[in-house]
Amino acid sequence: MLPFASCLPGSLLLWALLLLLLGAASPQDSEEPDSYTECTDGYEWDADSQHCRDVNECLTIPEACKGEMKCINHYGGYLCLPRSAAVINDLHGEGPPPPVPPAQHPNPCPPGYEPDEQESCVDVDECAQALHDCRPSQDCHNLPGSYQCTCPDGYRKVGPECVDIDECRYRYCQHRCVNLPGSFRCQCEPGFQLGPNNRSCVDVNECDMGAPCEQRCFNSYGTFLCRCNQGYELHRDGFSCSDIDECSYSSYLCQYRCVNEPGRFSCHCPQGYQLLATRLCQDIDECETGAHQCSEAQTCVNFHGGYRCVDTNRCVEPYVQVSDNRCFCPVSNPLCREQPSSIVHRYMSITSERSVPADVFQIQATSVYPGAYNAFQIRAGNTQGDFYIRQINNVSAMLVLARPVTGPREYVLDLEMVTMNSLMSYRASSVLRLTVFVGAYTF
């Protein structure tokens, strides 16, 4: 109460109270806003209508409802309902009113049936008409007068829902198993393929399927191996083959020359030789085979790697020919007094680089006189001392190669046998003229 209210008349007191109330409110507090643009949750301001309008959260919020639920918008919010749920709009709300169902007549048919045009009772397909309460994860199967909710193949019922069966837990697959929604798939390791039952794995014959082997392919369990023909070796890539250069491995494969060829090698011999099965080279005896060009007045002499045609009569005055390769100097001829009584022509062949000392030719006296002594010597042709004589006994001696010689080369050695008899003061000599052919090779 005002302190002075008791002193004022009643009318003045009412007037004073009105003035006090009007003065207590400031002009700013009595002003109202020109417009309102803020809306409550679930609404937004519409500038055209100058009113708040509902926000459709089902369109503006991504994945507003999870799983198999469907989003239903309503004023100021939204609902997440099962997809089988139906929503009846309020007749007093916005939008057209729901249609008025026609007048229904009593159904004379048992549950799950309905009359047709002929007034016969036919089954109601609840699955096709969505008159069932099966879960979205279930399959609806129509039955006479009813329906059944079952889980699809590969699913099992857990509570009201159907969940995927992990078939891989039961090891249906031989190798690898991949679980899929409602099913599974078997896979095989490399080198295998699924069998007819789509579960077991069978070996793949890569060799029949164009394996990248260059020469030979061998199939094995789960894989394959490449191999090469004889004379080839497998490359590092495991598929291609490279020729083996056998000639580079050893210098003893062939006696003369080794020639590498694709997948093999061959041995060759020089002219005048033939190749043996042992890969050795053997001299061809042209004189024996007739592969020579000597005339009838000549004698064919074979040596290592070739032959020589020599005259049949090689006797030079004062010698006369008495037989093949033998010349005799008559005693009646004064020119023969200082000459050997006979000269016999012989021929032989040796190889190059022969090991020394080597016995190469044996000299043998054809006749022996009582009390005679025979001495053997090299009369001519040994200017470099490549040979020497080793006397064995009174009637024989050996021609010895003193040092290695390299061909092709030819020696003509006069090997003399001197016969002496001191009691009869007798001295005579004969010569064996030996032609030695040295071949060009060590074989």
UniProtKB/Swiss-Prot annotation:
Post-translational modification: N-glycosylated; contains mostly complex-type glycans. Not O-glycosylated. Cleaved by ELANE; produces a 50-55 kDa fragment. Cleaved by MMP2 and MMP9; produces several fragments.
One biological process term in Gene Ontology: negative regulation of vascular associated smooth muscle cell proliferation
Organism, scientific name: Cricetulus griseus (Chinese hamster)
Gene3D superfamilies: Laminin (2.10.25.10)
Main location: secreted
SMART domains hit by this protein: EGF, EGF_CA
Domain EGF-like: 36-81, 123-163, 164-202, 203-242, 243-282, 283-328
Protein name, per record: EGF-containing fibulin-like extracellular matrix protein 2
Glycan attachment positions: 198, 394
Protein's job: Plays a crucial role in elastic fiber formation in tissue, and in the formation of ultrastructural connections between elastic laminae and smooth muscle cells in the aorta, therefore participates in terminal differentiation and maturation of smooth muscle cell (SMC) and in the mechanical properties and wall integrity maintenance of the aorta. In addition, is involved in the control of collagen fibril assembly in tissue throught proteolytic activation of LOX leading to cross- linking of collagen and elastin.
Key words, A-Z: Basement membrane, Calcium, Disulfide bond, EGF-like domain, Extracellular matrix, Glycoprotein, Repeat, Secreted, Signal
InterPro entries associated with the record: cEGF, EGF-like_Ca-bd_dom, EGF-like_CS, EGF-like_dom, EGF-type_Asp/Asn_hydroxyl_site, EGF_Ca-bd_CS, Fibulin_C, Growth_fac_rcpt_cys_sf
